[in-house]
Amino acid sequence: MLSGCNRFHVITREYVYVSARQVYLHDRVAAVSNRVALVSNGDALEVIEHGKRFVKVRTSKGEVGWLEEHAVIDDKLYAQFQDLQKKHAQDPVVANGELRDDLYLHVLPGRETPHFLLEAGNSKVQMLARGTVEKAPPPGSLPAPKPNTAQPGANTSGKPDQSAPASVKRASVAAPTAAPAAPPTPVAPPAPVAMEDWWLVRDAAGHTGWLLANRVDVDVPDEVGQYAEGQRMIAAYPIAKVLDDGTGREHKHEKKDGKGAKPQDAEDAAAAPAAPKEETEYVTVLSPQKNGLPYDFDQVRVFTWSLNHHRYETGYRLHGFQGYLPVKIGQETDKGVTYPTFSFQIATSPDVSIDPDNGVTRPVHPRTLEFRLEGNLVRRTGADQAPIILTHDPADSEKAKAAKKKKR
């Protein structure tokens, strides 16, 4: 009976996965050894034997050799990356980005968190969520020394000074005199904790992980990106398309002067397309150039295309609120006419909830604002028509404008 059960014994295989860019397998652990195979980032290797700081593995081609443990991740960490991919497989894309250089996908935000897959520079990624964590101190940095509040020459031990005369010693022991207390040395307030932003991203193959935000360039068309005015453009969403045939048919009634219809400006005439051209209109969201903010954006700006001037113009602008991704683009029909729409959440108070694991921030009391685009006009729609209360001082935006004007 026992022998029959042994036939159903399942052999459990242990695997590790290459986290280094590339690494050679060696035939033995020694100062002098031979290379037997080259493995690359993401390769799965079957474990044959564990050594001290080394592991013996077999490749999918049957090649066997040793490599250092720090060049691979184990099954448990690999499973965490797989779970992260499954959990966010259906998350909406809030923006598209391009990597500035080669970057590792991390399982959580943070420079010291485990990483696995290496994404090549210039790769396109889908951006899913923004998280904020404390910035790791640079290597070798020491904590600031505590301020010394003792006065020079003061004896803080509570014992008589052995270098003082005997009469002074006896006096200090028998009847210590209370000296007037010196005012405490003012202590500088602690410096604010440095924070840094990370993006949860998904690559073309569906691999998911966290990347340092300042190493990812958001894919924003240059035509609207130039109007950022010193702010960080978080995303640009196409909302509508218009056909510019160069005739300047934006207004039904041309302005009149004493001699008839006013001709189009020479500048507008020069900008008119030679042939009909389709132009895209955008909803953009922006934020100050800071990390660690308790919101994703604090400004929304709609760029519409002027058929008279043949350029982008601001169709709508709102700033000074706490906005949160994603921005949803849609359509609605009213009286037989279909209009493009957009909506997003804002906070009604400074209270936010922060995920302790990944630093993703969400409003405790959110509101959803809805808008639709009617030609070149943006109108507010939806059930919530209450006034929009600004929840923070948009001083950063104003400072950026002032600095720009000063340069001019």
Where are the regions that the model predicts?
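Short, Lys/Arg- and Gly-enriched loop/turn segments at beta-strand edges
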Residues: K52-R58, V133-A144
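Short, solvent-exposed interaction modules
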Residues: D83-A129
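Short loop/beta submotifs within extracellular cysteine-rich repeat domains
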Residues: S33, V64-W66, H106, T113, ...
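C-terminal motif of bacterial Sec signal peptides marking the signal peptidase cleavage site
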Residues: L2-G4
